[in-house]
Amino acid sequence: MMGVPARPAFVLLGDPIPVNSSVIPEPEGWEDSLTGLEGPDLWQRVLVTEVTRAIRYGRALTVVVAEVDGIVELGDQWGTDIARHSLREIAQCLRRLTRTSDYCTRIGLTRFGVVLTETNEVEAINFVERAREEAPRTLPRSGDGVRLAFGWASPLAGESAGSLVLRADRRLMQEMANR
């Protein structure tokens, strides 16, 4: 009998923001109970499957990682309920912007992963710009200090899912460093 494989290191690439876990629970399993999105276990499986398929059949695919910056400070200032509500609203915004063929998951305390199937990098940039514009509108007035940073990458021939996510993560870290 095969068990569920251990979560590889590429799934959660380190949360660059110190997080008070009493404010926001860590996502676990197949579904995230806080946001209603799929969880890190689905992210792990979908990444390998969809990246392999895209490379094998020469199909477009882009992986997007999004980091919510300022959510912990929001919780410290306005309370846990506001922080959790804000994270749920951002999750629902990302979900609304994806198609039924895409995957939108919560993969870390303040991190989301999106697999955009049949989407090249130019189309993914359009997704990112729509999310940058719409996500802040979903937050309560107290969420003014909350910002989203994004990284994205499309697979290169023969590239592993882990390498793809690392490239997207590097782009995310670069954006966060340039703020």
Task: Enumerate the language-model features and the residues they cover.
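Short, charged, intrinsically disordered terminal tails
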Residues: 24, 169, 173-179
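Short catalytic/binding micro-motifs of nucleotide second-messenger systems
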Residues: 96-101, 132-143
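Short, conserved catalytic or interaction motifs in soluble domains
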Residues: 76, 117, 140, 176-177
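Hydrophobic, well-ordered secondary-structure segments
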Residues: 116-121, 135
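Structural motif
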Residues: 61-63, 101-102, 145
